[in-house]
A protein has these predicted regions:
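Intrinsically disordered, low-complexity segments enriched in small/polar residues
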Residues: 1-4, 143
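Sec-dependent N-terminal signal peptides
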Residues: 3-12
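Exported/periplasmic ABC-transporter solute-binding proteins
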Residues: 15-72, 76-80, 84, 93-101, ...
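Glycine/small-residue-rich loop that forms an oxyanion/phosphate-binding "nest" at active or ligand-binding sites
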Residues: 89
């Protein structure tokens, strides 16, 4: 009888811990922010545990479909196939838009280019331009540092520019790898979250390009807070969290923390932008 009572208590404790164990998976754009939010949430709620991992928006959504995450972070909306799969599996979700991000295009700090227009950027990324000669006059190869197909940022840029990336584009695992590549490649171009640049210091040997929507127009930087607030930067986007309804009660206090003063301060302090109310 004592053994049965002990077993019941252990199981009850295990259930209690499971109810306060939150898994967050997905977007590499959001992963540093999610870690910071989780760490600060834990300081106030030490009865909770929050495990955060990246891997890309596609991985987060796949984990959602497989029942392996409570929150799927994504830098893009769900696509038609994913919506159909959720419906087929009987998974109902709630969508939270908790911050906004801008995608920054970067080159080596010594590269002789400060701004680029969308037409030229398209020709660089889709492989139409093989060298920088039409852009800077330098007859050196263009080396593209990008992401895998399951990356929300990869999908976002493809849709915004209506392109297929060059087959020669390097597929990197995340922001850190792209920045590292550009630091050592004087003819490289890559794209990363502006929040990552701001959060990891702008003193690195890289340069953030201004984006011109039309040739000759004023270039806008993704680091320009006022421009982002006015929605003047072409590559800015909302950041999503997809949450199965079965996990909502468990994660609601974490979501409330994100939306509260402390969470909002972390969002802006990490180089991301608040959603206008």
């Amino acid at each position: 009888m004592k053994y049965l009572m002990y077993l019941f208590i252990v199981l009850l404790a295990s259930c209690s811990n499971a109810d306060k164990s939150i898994k967050v998976k997905g977007s590499d754009t959001e992963v540093n922010l999610a870690v910071s939010l989780a760490e600060n949430f834990y300081k106030l709620h030490q009865d909770f545990s929050v495990a955060v991992s990246g891997g890309g928006s596609g991985l987060g959504i796949a984990s959602l479909l497989n029942g392996q995450t409570d929150i799927a972070n994504s830098s893009r909306p769900l696509n038609t196939e994913e919506v159909s799969l959720l419906k087929a599996k009987g998974i109902s979700i709630r969508t939270v838009v908790f911050a906004e991000d801008a995608t920054a295009f970067i080159v080596h700090k010594d590269f002789p280019l400060d701004a680029i227009d969308l037409v030229t950027l398209t020709k660089v990324l889709n492989g139409q331009y093989k060298t920088w000669k039409p852009v800077t006059g330098q007859d050196i190869p263009i080396n593209i540092y990008g992401r895998q197909n399951n990356s929300g940022t990869h999908s976002f840029i493809s849709k915004k520019l209506k392109i297929q990336f060059s087959r020669d584009a390097k597929e990197m695992n995340g922001n850190a790898q792209i920045v590292e590549g550009i630091k050592h490649d004087r003819s490289g171009i890559g794209y990363v979250g502006a929040g990552y640049i701001l959060n990891n210091g702008t003193e690195q040997p890289i340069k953030v390009l201004k984006i011109m929507e039309k040739p000759g127009s004023s270039g806008i930087s993704p680091l320009d807070v006022k421009a982002i607030a006015a929605h003047r930067y072409y590559f800015q986007r909302p950041l999503y969290q997809f949450i199965p309804l079965t996990s909502w009660n468990k994660v609601s206090s974490f979501i409330d923390f994100e939306k509260g003063p402390a969470g909002q301060k972390i969002i802006t302090g990490s180089g991301y932008y608040l959603i206008p109310k």
